[in-house]
Curated annotation (Swiss-Prot):
It holds the Pfam family FlgI. Assembles around the rod to form the L-ring and probably protects the motor/basal body from shearing forces during rotation. InterPro entries: Flag_FlgI (IPR001782). One of its GO terms (cellular component) is outer membrane-bounded periplasmic space. Keywords: Bacterial flagellum, Periplasm, Signal. The basal body constitutes a major portion of the flagellar organelle and consists of four rings (L,P,S, and M) mounted on a central rod. The keyword Signal applies. Residues 1-23 form the signal peptide. This is Flagellar P-ring protein.
Amino acid sequence: MKKRLAVLLVIVLTITFSFSVTTRIKDIAFFRGARDNQLFGIGLVVGLNGTGDSGNVNSPLLLEMMKKFGVQVSENDLKSKNTALVMVLADIPPFAKEGMRIDCVVASIADAKSLAGGYLLQTPLYGADGKVYAVAQGSVIIGGEDVKLSSNLQKRYRVVGYLLEGAIVERDIPSDMLDGDSVTILLRQPDITTAARVARAINEKFEMDLAKAIDPSAIKLTVPSAFQDDLITFLSLVEEIEVQPDVPARIVVNERTGTVLFGGDVKLSDFVISYGNFTISVTGGKIGDKDATISNLVSALKAAGATPQDIIAILQVIYESGYITGELIIM
């Protein structure tokens, strides 16, 4: 027997964002020049209990990388199962100074079975310009060893580890936010409306035309003469200004986890669709006696017991037919 249901989406987990909130500018944007920089290098982890490299890996690419990074390892070292070649990665934050410590990640680049219990020998970390900005050394910490979901998951975690504050900054990375008498605010999620709102909020706060949105991702901000010698104080005031970001109408479906996330002003046009044992209808902007909202459709689908596969198929058909106003993303 067919069930007449007004349904759209529900899966194992459904997350809804249908309300507007205000947030600080610092939570949705950053100043150009104040960003992380990536560092990388190749090092050697020692002290492994027979879980290191087998010595059978003879990749020309790997040998070339070792030569480029100045890694001098003997043939015997490569054959020892107590050592492992690793890639060392780190993000150095803006304004990091010489002597500060940063975290880093190590990952096996050969055929080691596990880095647990290993110790990373002194490894220089390079920036994109080829200069050394930090040096890493220390005990490798392995996360996820107690995860029992699958043997494959455990293996994957054992060949990736991290060093908590394991790298020392050796060279400052230049971070210049000021361009003449102005700075640029960059939105983490570019949006025309949000950019305009940020500029308007700043101008209202200081009661002068200081900010102007130049594109969906950037707002140019002129530093007032009163703050020319106190840029940090001015920027701290700007960061604390609250704005209401514009949220696009969007539905995101993750097929693997059965998660549906929807936000913004997602609307439904009138339609009738028959799918399997379901007949779905929206008439006059109503689902029965309720408004044709995503939340009401979700509730109906939960009660109906539709499978994630049903939901994804229905969403695709409705979206491709033009009855959903917004963007559908299936991951």
